[in-house]
Curated annotation (Swiss-Prot):
Alphabetized NCBIfam families for the sequence: hisT_truA
EC numbers for this chain: 5.4.99.12
Active site: 52 (nucleophile)
InterPro entries hit by this protein: PsdUridine_synth_cat_dom_sf, PsdUridine_synth_TruA, PsdUridine_synth_TruA_a/b_dom, PsdUridine_synth_TruA_C, TruA/RsuA/RluB/E/F_N
Subunit structure, as described in the record: Homodimer.
Taxonomy of the source species: Bacteria, Bacillati, Mycoplasmatota, Mycoplasmoidales, Mycoplasmoidaceae
Catalysed reactions listed for this entry: uridine(38/39/40) in tRNA = pseudouridine(38/39/40) in tRNA
Name used for this protein in its record: tRNA pseudouridine synthase A
Origin: domain of life: Bacteria
GO molecular function terms noted in the UniProt entry: RNA binding; tRNA pseudouridine(38-40) synthase activity
Keyword Lipid metabolism: no
C-alpha cells in the first residue's frame, strides 16, 4: 500500500532532510523507524522536498509505498508515534492511490521565516533569526513583492539543477512582536528562500537597492547573490496537493 504521511520536525539537531553518510537526517531516521517496526529492509520514503541543516518543518509530507506495508493508517500512525524521536511529530497518516508521489504531486509550498528584532531570547535562538536593528516592515514587503512572478532564480540559489525557473505565487508578512514572512511558490531551489530573505534584509538596511535586486532577477547569474539568512528562522510551513 501507499501512504501519505504528514510530519513536523525540529531541524536543530538534524543535518537536513536527505540521507547523508554518517549523518543524522530526517529521512534516515524515518526509514530506520520503518525498518525497525515493520522489518522491511528495502523501505524508501519520498519527501515533498528537501530542507537543509537547521531548517524546521511545521508540515513536511512524505510518501512510502511497499507491498509489505498493508495496514490501516491508524496502525501506522500509532506504531510510528511509539518509536519516533522526540524532535519529530507524526501529524497524519493517510492511505492513497498507488500513483501518489509526495514530490511530483505537490502543487505548491509555503515557507515561513521568523525574525526577532525585538529582544534576544536565549531559548528561541535555534528557532528564529535575531537582528539587533529594528526592521521597517513596509520596506521589507516592498522588496519581497519584487519576487512575485515567474523568474529564473539562478542568482538566488546554490542549486546545480539545469532548470532554475520557479514561480512565486504570493508573499505576505505578519507582525506581533516577531516578524513572520510567508512565501508561497510552485517550487524552490536549494537555499532560494534564505537568499531571498537575505537580499530583502539588505535592502531594509540600505545595503542593496531595489534596482539591484531587479537586476539579479532579470539577469540571472549563479553566484551573484551569495549571502544566506541563517537556517534557524526557516520553516517548511505547508505543502499543497
Amino acid at each position: 500500500m501507499n501512504y501519505k504521511i504528514s510530519i513536523r520536525y525540529d531541524g536543530s539537531l538534524f543535518y537536513g532532510w536527505a540521507k547523508q553518510p554518517q549523518k543524522r537526517t530526517v529521512q534516515e531516521h524515518l526509514e530506520t523507524v520503518f525498518k525497525t517496526i515493520f522489518k522491511i529492509n528495502d523501505i524508501k520514503i519520498i519527501g515533498s522536498g528537501r530542507t537543509d541543516r537547521g531548517v524546521h518543518a511545521y508540515e513536511q509530507v512524505f510518501s512510502v509505498n511497499h507491498h509489505q506495508l498493508n495496514y490501516e493508517p491508524q496502525v501506522i500512525y500509532q506504531a510510528l508515534c511509539s518509536q519516533i524521536d522526540p524532535d519529530v511529530q507524526i501529524l497524519k497518516v493517510q492511505s492513497v492511490h498507488d500513483t501518489f508521489h509526495a514530490q511530483h504531486d505537490a502543487i505548491s509550498k509555503t515557507y515561513q521565516y521568523i525574525i526577532n528584532d525585538y529582544e534576544f531570547d536565549l531559548f528561541k535562538h535555534n528557532y528564529e533569526y535575531f537582528i539587533h536593528q529594528k526592521i521597517n516592515d513596509q520596506k521589507l514587503l516592498e522588496a519581497l513583492e519584487l519576487f512575485v512572478g515567474e523568474y529564473d532564480f539562478k542568482s538566488f540559489s546554490t542549486s546545480e539543477l539545469p532548470l532554475t525557473t520557479r514561480k512565486i505565487n504570493w508573499v505576505k508578512i505578519t507582525r506581533n512582536t516577531r516578524l513572520e514572512i510567508y512565501i508561497n511558490g510552485n517550487g524552490f531551489l536549494k537555499n532560494m528562500v534564505r537568499m531571498i530573505i537575505s537580499a530583502c534584509i539588505d535592502y531594509v538596511f540600505n545595503k542593496i537597492s531595489l534596482t539591484q535586486i531587479k537586476t539579479l532577477l532579470t539577469n540571472p547569474k549563479k553566484g551573484a547573490s551569495v549571502k544566506l539568512a541563517p537556517p534557524c528562522g526557516l520553516y517548511l510551513y505547508k505543502v499543497y496537493y
